[in-house]
Amino acid sequence: LEHDKNVICEKPFVQSTTQAKELKKLADEKGLIIVEAITNLYLENFKQIQKELNKIAPIHIVNLNYTQYSSRYDAFLEGKIAPVFDPKKDGGALMDLNIYNIHLVSALFGLPDQVQYYANMQKGVDTSGILHLSYPDKQASLTASKDSYVTPRSFIEGEKGSIYFDGSTGTLDNFTVEMRNEQPKRYNLNKYPHRMAAEFNTFAQMIDQHDTQKADEAFVNTLETMQILTKAKNSMI
């Protein structure tokens, strides 16, 4: 930014809400684009999930799970600390994996009233944990794990039905809508085989057209996510 370059910043955007605001302020002052690279919010499946929410509403329970046994976990147990497990570099399950869950919940439901993170700690870092978000009308449980193995499944549960999907919340390869007393319907609307294609096509268009409005809209979600992350880290148990 200081060298007048537009910036695509890998998730998590920064370490704190304060840093996020500082970078956005600098970008705005220089008339530049700054945007967070977060795959799931730009996928066609996510956009369709947004449209399907009203069908199952009112929504009371959200369970999102991103479990991925880390390829560096065995080395971590032997004392070889990679950056993704280094607390000094904001490693750990919350910042590396639960960030995807937080982005989804923030984009779908906004900021919660209460935030509490329950972490499994090893060598000073959270290798897994559950983030609980409390809303006036719903409860959300966001699980992320780098030390366990499972095929994760996530649910959004409402009075009229549910939306659920298997696998990573970062890729959203497909999802199913199941209404009460109806047959479930499975969807996959993603256009590209690579999970990053949709977001980078959006970023290219955003930068080519200097679409600051779209960048501002993306930053709203980034800032909300950083606010939740900051509270989660401060609440860590």
Task: Say what each PLM segment does.
Residues L1-L41:
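Beta-strand-loop-alpha-helix segment that lines the small-molecule cofactor/substrate pocket
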